[in-house]
């Protein structure tokens, strides 16, 4: 977990073993051929995990992502974009494969 002050986790959230929450990444818009990537500055963005989310084992949540209420992130997924509520998202990068009706 990086920059924990940028991470918001709702109620009844399951974050399973080996999950990484990354609030920073290298800003590759500054990259130049022949220079080390490590010379690129870090950019930071928050992660917001809403109520009732399940994040499967070994998943990676990238900076700037919001995971909607009741969503399920499949094991080993890399979440690079916002995930809507009440769905299942899997893969690298994570894509929605199923949606659920909110019964409330």
Outline where the language-model segments fall:
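Flexible, glycine/small-residue-enriched loop-and-beta-strand segment within the central core
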Residues: 1-66, 92-93, 100-101
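C-terminal/domain-terminus segments
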Residues: 65-90
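C-terminal end-helix/capping segment
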Residues: 83, 87-104
């Amino acid at each position: 977990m990086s920059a924990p002050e940028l991470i918001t986790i709702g109620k009844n959230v399951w974050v399973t073993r080996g999950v990484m929450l990354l609030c920073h990444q290298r800003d590759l818009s500054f990259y130049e051929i022949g220079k080390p990537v490590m010379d690129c500055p870090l950019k930071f963005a928050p992660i917001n995990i809403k109520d009732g989310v399940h994040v499967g084992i070994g998943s990676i949540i990238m900076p700037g992502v919001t995971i909607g209420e009741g969503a399920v992130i499949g094991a080993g997924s890399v979440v690079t974009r916002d995930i809507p509520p009440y769905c299942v998202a899997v893969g690298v990068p994570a894509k929605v494969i199923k949606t659920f009706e909110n019964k409330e």
